[in-house]
């Protein structure tokens, strides 16, 4: 029996192991909707990996909203790929190699979360609202029973990785609009070559500085960002040149200040909040936001490289 058919007989909370510690999203808060309330019994998140999907398992990509610029559409789900390969081997070798159903279910659920994140990013790029009906029809399909869980995880991932939140403006029609987290007036999509929102990284850097006090040494910033697989001097598929983004772009946008530590020899540098950040938000709001979406007092971040949407044809 296909996994999609078998999964309809499972409960959302069954078979989901705690992965929030790895993702830093246990207890993450999605928009206060009936979907999130229904999913509250399952507070863990399933790890999602984006990259290239094996051709044999490539799903039909969600239809791009009208007016949306092209986003990369190919995705990769190693767990799903492994489950698929194991299933193929089982057909040849017999039931002894049948994959663990729990692992296969987790991987398939992760796939749906990733597909919904991708669909919502397309909607955000097009500056269009989104309805529950669109999400069900374009992405979720016969996984409708698991929609509360899928929606909650996708919403939390948008907040932490991309700095975007969904706000329900019509509870009856289940209509949602997008907003930048913390009410920031910047999302990182300014410019012709900006295909991914970067407010998530900005908020993380602001949180690191706030946690350190009034300023944070540059080496501390890169130490923290290394948890996201974001490194100084290494080109990133989402961020481009991270060093340039932090020391030039965010500085030019007046969200960060980058200065030499007085009296340092050899020269050392540090980051401070810029005037625009001080006007639009506060230390308390930023730290509260990070604690809320990471599910505890210790801020941890999912690897951004696992959320990369690589170049592909729309």
From Swiss-Prot:
Expressed in many tumors of several types, such as melanoma, head and neck squamous cell carcinoma, lung carcinoma and breast carcinoma, but not in normal tissues except for testes and placenta. Never expressed in kidney tumors, Leukemias and lymphomas. GO terms for biological process: negative regulation of autophagy; negative regulation of endoplasmic reticulum stress-induced intrinsic apoptotic signaling pathway; negative regulation of protein processing; negative regulation of transcription by RNA polymerase II. Residues 65-87 have a biased composition (Polar residues). Residues 21-44 have a biased composition (Low complexity). InterPro entries: MAGE, MAGE_N, MAGE_WH1, MAGE_WH2, MHD_dom. Residues 109-308 form the MAGE domain. Keywords: Tumor antigen, Ubl conjugation, Ubl conjugation pathway. GO terms for cellular component: endoplasmic reticulum; nucleus. Changing residue 170 to A: Abolishes HLA-A1 binding. Residues 1-99 are annotated as: Disordered. Ubiquitinated by the DCX(DCAF12) complex specifically recognizes the diglutamate (Glu-Glu) at the C-terminus, leading to its degradation. One of its GO terms (molecular function) is caspase binding. Residues 1-20 have a biased composition (Basic and acidic residues). Activator of ubiquitin ligase activity of RING-type zinc finger-containing E3 ubiquitin-protein ligases that acts as a repressor of autophagy. May enhance ubiquitin ligase activity of TRIM28 and stimulate p53/TP53 ubiquitination by TRIM28. Proposed to act through recruitment and/or stabilization of the Ubl-conjugating enzyme (E2) at the E3:substrate complex. May play a role in embryonal development and tumor transformation or aspects of tumor progression. In vitro promotes cell viability in melanoma cell lines. Antigen recognized on a melanoma by autologous cytolytic T-lymphocytes. Interacts with TRIM28. PANTHER family: MELANOMA-ASSOCIATED ANTIGEN 3-RELATED, MELANOMA-ASSOCIATED ANTIGEN MAGE ANTIGEN. This is Melanoma-associated antigen 3. It comes from Homo sapiens.
